[in-house]
Amino acid sequence: MKGEYNVTLNTKNNVIKYTISISRQITIVCGKSGIGKTLLHDMVAEYCKMEGRGAVEISSGSDKVSIEPFDGSVALLREVENGKKFKDGTTKLKWLEKPSQKIFIIDEDLIITKGINFADAIRYTDAYYIIFTRDLRLHKYMYNSVWDIITLEDVGIVGIDNRAVRAYNEFNGYVKGYSEVIHEDYATGREICELALCEKIKTSYGNLNLVSHIKKNYKNTSILVIADGANFSNIMERLKKVSKRKQLLIYLILPESTEYVLLHNAIFSESRNVSEYLLDPVSKYNTENWITYEKMYEQVIIEESSKIDEINNYEKVEGLETYKTESFIDTYRAILTRIDGIKSSYNVKYSLYKIENGKLMVGDLHSSKINELDKENEK
């Protein structure tokens, strides 16, 4: 499965309308309990049952892709492997029929989705999954693949229906002071980041350990966190909780991945393959080949670095020295330019968030959500 789709669901009288943009295998839809999620899932179920003749209209923007509810019992077979169960009490899952060019809608009440075996089962399948949940730690998804269902009453407008908006609004300011830097990567990313910042930084040894590392080591201070955004999963919500409990101000810099940043270096500029992946990653990413964009960029840099004599074949631990040149350090500085005094000759996309007292600080949060809704309504 590849490509970007604007999944639009609405009642034919336009009283209820949702539009969600998806371009990765997993998209998360969250929100307060009872607001919209179950209603949206029921809208899809009605559409499929009535074969488009009911009160619900649905479109993916492509006649090659079908959208349908996922109920688990139809698509997957539960079976015991050697009579044993997994630690979470569930059994191995096996596809009865591999999906092809499908977008599945999955409700959080479906118990089958909560085990690690379900996460394994949907990997490398020719399908996208829109999952309605408030906590899904076992799956890998990007921070901007999370959508929130809100009522416009939440932003001060009364009497208008629900809408789906991206859950996390970026911080539009600058990093102003921090006591310490934590990088989730223990090898390449951290070492190059140290050279770019000219200071020693800590590591959490991976995204999975990031929250526990911060919870254990910091309180009543401000910190700067740098992590791969491609598989950030539910860490944003957990950081908000830690920020409130530990009285932390957390600046969070999220590039797609370290490999994504390094591929912007001039040494790869002659590679048409690299240019295509950086300029139009949506058309290159295929769920049957990679779980996340991070894995895609890692494969690209390994393949392309093997063709260049001036640098070693890219490995996260070995052969790192050739990536410690001023040119690569300058490339990495491109994601640090919101820190006072740091400049770069490169331009690399990344996101900056500021979490304080458990909340994302973005200026006027309500106005930003209203602006997004206005843009959607203009379509």
Regions flagged by a language model, labelled:
Residues 1-18, 151-154, 158-160:
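N-terminal pre-Walker A segment at the start of P-loop NTPase domains
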Residues 29:
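Hydrophobic anchor at the beta1->P-loop junction of P-loop NTPases
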Residues 122-150:
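Sensor-1/coupling segment of RecA-like P-loop NTPase cores
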Residues 40-41:
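Post-Walker A alpha-helix
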Residues 110-111, 118, 151-379:
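Acidic, divalent-metal-binding catalytic cores of TOPRIM
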Residues 73-117:
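Conserved P-loop NTPase "ATPase switch" module shared by AAA+ and STAND
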Residues 37:
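Conserved lysine of the Walker
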Residues 33:
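The conserved Walker
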